[in-house]
């Protein structure tokens, strides 16, 4: 099978890859999938492209997604762990013995990834998870709980390792929402965006963006 990507050193914008209408993407978010060979659509597991009554995968702007990251969709996929059996009898109606089975399917809600989120290679995001702006998800993490903004998490199941900045700095970043700025403002602020000077960036925002 031909590799969708030409190089491991270059990602492709999601806006130029995604064909599934149930995946919503923001500007400049990209997937770097060279080591797995497929486009981003295949990262969204069990997400039906031809139905509009399913949970959506929503990805914000300026997100970086590593090769082989996966987003498990389709709710509980017909498995009820609180029933005597988790087996999806309902989906095997061709077997007469299963004809009275109830539909065990439950939606999990949309999976929502914030803005400026970095998701490492082969991380797995479970159904209905919400990941806050600025979060960092370590490679091969299994994300089973919502992630607060600007947290760094890792492990299986994933746990918070630390926050990227102080609570005050995070509050300023959330107030500024730099990912929504027009490109000319981002261009001028680039030296600050490429630094740890959050207070300086906030000062720029107050003077030139608001």
Curated annotation (Swiss-Prot):
Query: Is this entry keyworded Repeat?
Result: yes
One of the GO BP terms on file: response to antibiotic
Say if the entry is tagged with keyword Acyltransferase: yes
Q: Which Gene3D superfamilies match?
A: Hexapeptide repeat proteins (2.160.10.10)
Task: Show the catalytic activity.
Answer: chloramphenicol + acetyl-CoA = chloramphenicol 3-acetate + CoA
- Annotated keywords: Acyltransferase, Antibiotic resistance, Repeat, Transferase, Transposable element
Functional note: This enzyme is an effector of chloramphenicol resistance in bacteria.
Q: Which family does it belong to?
A: Belongs to the transferase hexapeptide repeat family.
User: What PANTHER family does its record include?
Assistant: ACETYLTRANSFERASE, CHLORAMPHENICOL ACETYLTRANSFERASE
Query: What's the protein name?
Result: Chloramphenicol acetyltransferase
The species is: Morganella morganii
């Amino acid at each position: 099978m031909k590799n969708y990507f030409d190089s491991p050193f270059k990602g492709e914008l999601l806006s130029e890859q995604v064909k599934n209408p149930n995946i919503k993407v923001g500007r400049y978010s990209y997937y770097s999938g060279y080591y797995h060979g497929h486009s981003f659509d295949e990262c969204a597991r069990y997400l039906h492209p031809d139905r509009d009554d399913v949970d959506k995968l929503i990805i914000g702007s300026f997100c970086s997604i590593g090769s082989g990251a996966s987003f498990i969709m389709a709710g509980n996929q017909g498995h009820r762990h609180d029933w005597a059996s988790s087996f999806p009898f309902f989906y095997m109606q061709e077997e007469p013995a299963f004809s009275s089975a109830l539909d065990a399917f439950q939606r999990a809600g949309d999976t929502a990834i914030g803005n400026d989120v970095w998701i490492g290679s082969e991380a797995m995001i479970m159904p209905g998870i919400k990941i806050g702006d600025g979060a960092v998800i370590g490679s091969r993490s299994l994300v089973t709980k919502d992630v607060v903004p600007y947290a760094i998490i890792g492990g299986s199941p994933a746990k918070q390792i630390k926050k990227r900045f102080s609570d005050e700095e995070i509050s300023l970043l959330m107030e500024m929402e730099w990912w929504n700025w027009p490109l000319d403002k981002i261009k001028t602020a680039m030296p600050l965006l490429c630094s740890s000077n959050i207070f300086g960036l906030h000062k720029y925002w107050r003077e030139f963006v608001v």
